[in-house]
Amino acid sequence: MAAISRVIDLFTSDQEYIGKTVRAQGWVRTKRDSKAGVSFIELNDGSCLRNLQVVADQGHPEYRQLLESITTGCAVMVEGSIAYSPGKGQTIELKADRITLYGTADPAVYPLQKKRHSFEFLRQIGHLRPRTNTIGAVSRVRNRLSYAIHQFFQDRGFYYIHTPIITASDCEGAGEMFRVTTLDAQNAPAKVPEEVYRADFFGKPAFLTVSGQLQAEIYALALGRVYTFGPTFRAENSNTSRHLAEFWMVEPEMAFCDLEGDLEIAQALIRHLIGVALQDCAEDLDFFTRFIEPTLRGTLETVAFSPFETVTYTEAVRILKESGENFEFPVEWGNDLQAEHERYLTEKVFRKPAAVIHFPRALKPFYMRVNDDGNTVAAMDILVPGTGEIIGGSQREERPDILVEQMRLKSVAPEDYKWYLDLREFGSVPHAGFGMGLERLVQFVTGLPNIREVIPFPRTPGHAEF
């Protein structure tokens, strides 16, 4: 009996399979019956965008009755021989000798048919949307980028560490965290006093992590170079195309590293990941360029092969104010840059990716290193055309006295972070790191307008299916 062959392997090595007996399995995208007594079945197994055309003789004694039951959405296994295809759009086809029907799909109720469905509709059937061309392609791109992230850091001597999902620390200081508790939610007071916290599972307030950075610093100051890659959570009531309540972050931390070294690694990571996508996901990117964003491939090539522009926050504000552009959000020194400002810089001014450095001290969290001017911190944002910020990072404050001052300015209690201050008391060194959201990266690489399409199970305000 022939081994099961993936569709992608049949297309990649098509010459090797001509005349050979193979078995392919997957889900039926379409079936077309011709007047010549032949049925054409488009079979997809998820391994690639292309469908394998199965040619089935309607009078074949092995499966003639079975053919009537095969409709869009059915799961089948087909055994037969590979032959050159005379039709347009495919090089090979599978001439069926035997068909096994694993599972049927009633065409009267199966929601995916041969037409373009809106993304809003597909989100309502999240358990079936991976079977569409778009979400299948997104999944393959996401997989390849995730693997490439590990490759990048492993090849450069970073150690992969696992930081906690449940934490008592708020890295961002914004307070928008999901609380973890075993207390009775129906009778919990609005403000829980300390004695009630002590009755909780951990004996103190605990939350889902917003970042693994602080914990990663612990290991960077022992192993030198580390990274963490896992889910993070924000209880931010933002119902936009750029925000999720649950998403995946990659966060490297490097000892003996300043802002310049941080920038170097961040830019190298972006170039590496975009280069991998262009090389290894070409078919899927062609699909996105054709159906989602016509300028996608050109934008990706610009980011992969162009030098990054570097400007200070102060310079960026000056450029924006002098542009004469009518922005929705006013541009003033001390205000955070919005997506429209970031895109204007990369798309209209520099026409390539950019790094903005040295942000106002008041805008950034307590852990960022204060510059000598006392007004700015050694922070950086990496911006790309079409998206805006894709990476944010900084050199970390390694001086204990200034770190305590920063904490007090940001209303962070130093006594709650004694362990973090200890890292500055015992063998402190300059160190730096950054965070990159995987979904923001996948959204950029695929050109999809809404971030909810690039994560398998989007978590947003009012939505937590599955």
UniProtKB/Swiss-Prot annotation:
Keywords: Aminoacyl-tRNA synthetase, ATP-binding, Cytoplasm, Ligase, Nucleotide-binding, Protein biosynthesis. The keyword Metal-binding does not apply. CDD domains: AsxRS_core, EcAsnRS_like_N. It is found in: Cytoplasm. GO terms for molecular function: asparagine-tRNA ligase activity; ATP binding; nucleic acid binding. One of its GO terms (biological process) is asparaginyl-tRNA aminoacylation. Its EC number is 6.1.1.22. GO terms for cellular component: cytoplasm. It catalyses: tRNA(Asn) + L-asparagine + ATP = L-asparaginyl-tRNA(Asn) + AMP + diphosphate + H(+). It is an enzyme of class 6 (ligase). It comes from the Bacteria. Homodimer. Belongs to the class-II aminoacyl-tRNA synthetase family. NCBIfam families: asnS, PRK03932.1. This is Asparagine--tRNA ligase. It comes from Syntrophobacter fumaroxidans (strain DSM 10017 / MPOB).
